[in-house]
Curated annotation (Swiss-Prot):
Allows the formation of correctly charged Asn-tRNA(Asn) or Gln-tRNA(Gln) through the transamidation of misacylated Asp-tRNA(Asn) or Glu-tRNA(Gln) in organisms which lack either or both of asparaginyl-tRNA or glutaminyl-tRNA synthetases. The reaction takes place in the presence of glutamine and ATP through an activated phospho-Asp-tRNA(Asn) or phospho-Glu-tRNA(Gln). InterPro entries: Asn/Gln-tRNA_amidoTrfase_suB/E, Asn/Gln-tRNA_Trfase_suB/E_cat, Asn/Gln_amidotransferase, Asn/Gln_tRNA_amidoTrase-B-like, GatB, GatB_C_1, GatB_Yqey_C_2, Gln-tRNA_amidoTrfase_suB_CS. This is Aspartyl/glutamyl-tRNA(Asn/Gln) amidotransferase subunit B. It comes from the Archaea.
């Protein structure tokens, strides 16, 4: 019997703004670098009578920028006030969280509707297993992005988050996946039976969101298949087991007892304010990808790979400019940045910015290959060493240290070719019988004998002269 199964998913994504001070006080936000409960003040820890400062302007600017880049309509010339969202949990000493009404609404990103974007304060960090709370994080500015329930599969949600995090990297001043948290809301329809919405709180990685949705899809389907009912509830993600566990029945807005915060004046966004922020907005990844294809004439797949890493995209443009911005320069930059450098980054599981490589390093390497100081094979070795040495050594220094310059002494090359011919009787026979590709294995032998220091074109010429007589 065939199954009729569909799902709807919406996300509430929380991303920290990288400010020096917290949202409502002057305490620093570097909570990971200090001892527990040191970056705190009466405002952070909710002392009665402690009055918050006006909200951090940089945090507001970043919320405006995120909302604009997600295509939201801005809330202009209206009071944007902060509310007190009441709930009891050890990480929230005041008993309420300060959270704004929407700054932007009705946007869209990758075909997914954006319900709203607003600002709020991060709570502290509670460790139930130890019974400890660290309030250093309390009050750090958070931007919350609420989506419509438009995602139809775990894969779609995963791709949405990947692209959203890429956008955050382009925007800058936002902390990435390490601090991002998402609440996932999922409901399914199974053989005509509609289940209630389930929320899974505080999932802190893209992989986690994907696993939660896969698990909930199967769990909810099995409940409905057995004739059960999906409860309207909030669940927790048990990351070590990759499962979810019931926490409590789902809250409504009334449960949070929202009231305007009497200690904070409303924000009023003007057109001038929004336009000033817009003027500082970076090029989006999607626009950069399109421009790379049009401006440099490269393939869409190559543009996608380059643009996936902002620093990699920047170094590509700088290298192309140094190489002359012509067809050959672009082709070499694609080969050595998109293909070879990216290969090494993926193998080492690092991002470009972690390598400390500079554009001039890549230009020096490519020029060494262009002028045949080194072979392409050696170029691959050098790029691996450049990454391993974290940019501390230039390509020329590495080439010199490792003795990897191309062999220019013809007699040395001829000697290597003669030895390769002697050890490749079958390949020589096949070549003489008309199989041109058989020569490749002989060339490979020469490259091995010379540790990749031979120029392949020169090797082929010498081999043909010696074999063809």
């Amino acid at each position: 019997m065939s199954e009729d199964l569909s799902m709807k998913c919406g996300l509430e994504i929380h991303v920290q703004v990288d400010t020096n001070s917290k949202l409502f006080c002057q305490c620093p936000t570097n909570y990971k670098d200090v001892e527990p409960n040191t970056n705190i003040c009466p405002v952070c820890i909710g002392h009665p009578g402690a009055k918050p400062m006006p909200p951090n302007k940089k945090a507001i600017d970043m919320a405006i920028m995120v909302a604009k880049m997600l295509g939201c309509e801005m809330v202009i010339d209206k009071d944007i006030y902060f509310q007190r969202k009441h709930y009891n949990y050890p990480d929230l000493p005041s008993g309420y969280q300060k959270t704004s009404v929407p700054i932007g609404e009705h946007g869209t990103f990758l075909g997914v509707g954006i319900t709203e974007v607003h600002l709020e304060e991060d709570p502290g960090q509670y460790k139930p297993d130890l019974g400890t709370v660290d309030y250093n994080r309390s009050g750090t500015p958070l931007i919350e992005i609420v989506t419509d329930p438009d995602m139809k599969s775990p894969e779609e949600a995963r791709e949405f988050l990947r692209q959203l995090l890429r956008l955050f990297r382009y925007i800058g001043n936002l902390r990435g996946e390490g601090t991002m948290r998402a609440d996932t809301n999922i409901s399914i329809k199974y053989n005509g039976i509609q289940g209630n919405r389930v929320e899974v709180k505080n999932v802190n990685s893209i992989r986690g969101v994907y696993k939660v949705l896969k698990y909930e899809l199967i769990r909810q389907k099995n409940v409905l298949r057995r004739g059960g009912e999906i409860k309207l509830e909030t669940r927790a993600f048990m990351e070590s087991q990759m499962i979810t566990k019931g926490m409590r029945s789902k809250e409504t807005a009334d449960d949070y007892r929202y009231i305007p915060d009497p200690d904070l004046q409303p924000i009023v966004l003007s057109n001038d304010w929004v336009e000033k922020v817009e003027a500082q907005m970076p090029e989006t990844p999607m626009n950069k990808e399109k421009r790379f294809v049009e401006q440099y004439g490269i393939k869409e797949d190559d543009a996608k790979v380059l643009v996936s890493d902002l620093e990699l995209a920047d170094v590509f443009e700088k290298v192309v400019a140094e190489l002359g911005n012509d067809k050959d320069g672009i082709s070499l930059a694609v080969t050595w940045i998109r293909n070879e450098l990216k290969r090494v980054l993926v193998y080492n599981k690092i991002e470009f910015f972690e390598t400390n490589l500079k554009p001039e390093h890549m230009v020096e390497l490519i020029n060494s290959i262009k002028d045949k100081t080194i072979s392409q094979k050696i170029g691959k070795t050098i790029i691996e060493q450049m990454v391993e040495h974290k940019g501390e050594k230039t390509p020329k220094e590495l080439i010199s240290e490792m003795g990897l310059t191309v062999i220019e002494d013809t007699s040395e090359l001829e000697k290597a070719c003669e030895e390769a011919i002697k050890n490749s009787e079958k390949a020589i026979e096949d070549y003489k019988s008309g199989n041109q590709r058989a020569l490749n294995s002989v060339v490979g032998q020469v490259m091995k004998l010379t540790r990749g220091r031979a120029e392949p074109g020169t090797v082929v010429e010498i081999l043909k002269k010696k074999i063809d007589g």
